[in-house]
Amino acid sequence: SGTTLKALMNTSKINKDIKGGNKLLENWPKGAGTNETTLKVLLSTFGFQLESVQREAPVLGKIENYTVKLKRPENGRKSNYKHPIAAFGSEAEEKGFRVICLFGKTDASRLIDTFKEVGNAKHTLVLLDYALPLAERRILARKTKTDLSGKIFAVVDRVVLVYLAKHYTETAMNRMLMAVIMPFASYQPYIDKSVDIMPQEIFIGRKYELEKIESPTGINIVYGGRQLGKSALL
């Protein structure tokens, strides 16, 4: 109580990372909401490559609500996402995800009730201007898996914010964000039907073959039997 967010920062880091951590704190929605410009800076500092951030009508008439789309590479290549969460990666290039802002003291049960009211039309990143206690965080981890279905509700609260600001590393930030918030959310990233499109985030292996296909002087015919990964490579 009475301690500012900046006072909790680690001052032993290199200057560039200190600036990045400070930028997270400066653009965090505090009490009275945010706007498109500030949210763009915050999400970019979290490591998202943004195409657009669009303010939508408030959810339930009171909850700040934004639609975020990520940028596709202009050269036709695939984005190099450093985490396996397609909902906040390649899938968001086309479908986007939602950001909502919540303020003030709460608990896991109230959060789950709010998420149900908001609805599961989109995967949702929740910016919560409150520090969830550890016990409530554990309850939230359980309830997101038992009480919610279909879409992600991933919570970034003040605890997550300060942790990421103190350990800010520009090239690893998006991966760190996912590693910290996803254990307390529910998501099944794997594809169990071969007819479904495999997200690039979970395509592992075949690096040599992929490089040969992408090379201007490489191969231009891909062949093989059924279920051997031809479509995944392409």
Predicted features by range, described:
Residues K105-E117:
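A short, acidic, amphipathic alpha-helical segment used as a generic capping/interface helix at domain edges
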Residues S1-H83:
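Acidic-basic catalytic patches of nuclease active cores, encompassing PD-(D/E)XK
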Residues V99-F103, S194-I197:
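Glycine-rich phosphate-binding "P-loop"
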Residues K105-A108, L132, P216-G218:
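Short beta->alpha connector loops
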Residues E91, K116-G119:
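A general structural signal for short secondary-structure junctions and capping/turn motifs
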Residues R175-Q227, A232-L233:
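Walker A/P-loop-proximal flanking segment of P-loop NTPase domains
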Residues L60-G61, Y66-L70, G76-R77, G96-R98, ...:
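Charged, structured surface patches that assemble and position nucleic-acid processing machinery
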